[in-house]
């Protein structure tokens, strides 16, 4: 048995033996048939919806499991990885011994041995010079469908000489019975070995572990080569001008980068090298909770045959209730990027970025709707990765909840955050890019900044009119803010003007400034971080 050069002997090199059959890079048509097979049970089986997409259930894991993430600590990683047990910063890069890795690998390979396997060969990264050739091995048809959607699909010619740089073995059906004596978090695991170039998955069925696993690997490899690795969306204008949008969930990253006047490069993961900005992925992984055709026509229209829904409620007639979050608020859909019409073709890459937009949704009502950042301020706010959620009514919570996530993606960083900031600013200086902090949150009026005003701000950034505006300095945070912008309500540009008195703003600003200062202390164990303290707020 040999399929595209994959033989039982090749799989034996990974530790997988006695394979019954190999389904290699199956077509969407075959996957559609396989994942709905009446012989499948439990989480393996998908169901067809009225929209044409197949829906699956990922079990108790409806999101990533960061506490179960491990990296083998060896000569390759010992002095490069940002470890959870070293330094000031708390992170999810938990060290794993070679001995425990060997045991976990045996668990997964035993699970996959003797089975009918689906193998997907794909690329991570649209630039051939820095892309990873990744081989995914799974016994579950819909997991093969997920990675076919999310990663870059090679041509037949590219598959002929395909040599994997990295192997992902998904043994979702197996768990680790020895986790306690090994000092691990639970019986489930997502483990990486940078020397063997392998990712192992056990116990969790969540598809995003494969997507974000490879993002984490790119986040390790690329910055060490001087290439920026970014958790951002990106688009390009008619004149070839590229903008990247950083932001945590709920800040408007997807909404604001989706613009009828600009083509989408990608919605989530990008690199920036000597040639420009490029997508890591060949698909999109969009949230679907409360999705409607009216509010998000592009995403809604992408949910059709070949798309894969996760953890949504499917009614008896096959209709999807996107408003039902009873299983999870993190309902998702994956689909190939060409399901979105206004995209960069044929390859998801463009030139160098000239605008870098850091999005925040400040529920404290302190930050201005837009400010122009210096190079040091860019690094400071990039490392801070701030956003905040409105206070809930439960348990008497009366103040907003701040979130600080390094580089707007702390969960996926394998190196110290300052390394990502340094590489980003180096790329920005080389291209003459300017950064802006855009607040899509609230102000002193208690109302959220309108999408109309925010879009006006984004337009002013992209067309350059903000750089011609008269600027003033906002105290405490020392931010340069425009006094007026075309199409934007001038009364909101200085957040102090939205309060009954400047003293009210000052009190809140001092409080938020202290939160920034306290958070940023964890980066001061690196010289680059300590040097940036002066670019932050002052009390």
From Swiss-Prot:
What's its catalytic activity? oxaloacetate + ATP = phosphoenolpyruvate + ADP + CO2
Per UniProt, subcellular location reads as: Cytoplasm
Predominant place of localization: cytoplasm
According to the UniProt record, what class of enzyme is this?
lyase
Name the UniProt key words of this record, in alphabetical order. Answer: ATP-binding, Cytoplasm, Decarboxylase, Gluconeogenesis, Lyase, Manganese, Metal-binding, Nucleotide-binding
Where on this chain does ATP bind?
Answer: 212, 231, 247-255, 296, 332, 448-449, 454
Which positions does UniProt annotate for Mn(2+) binding?
212, 231, 268
Subunit relationships: Monomer.
Name of the protein this chain belongs to: Phosphoenolpyruvate carboxykinase (ATP)
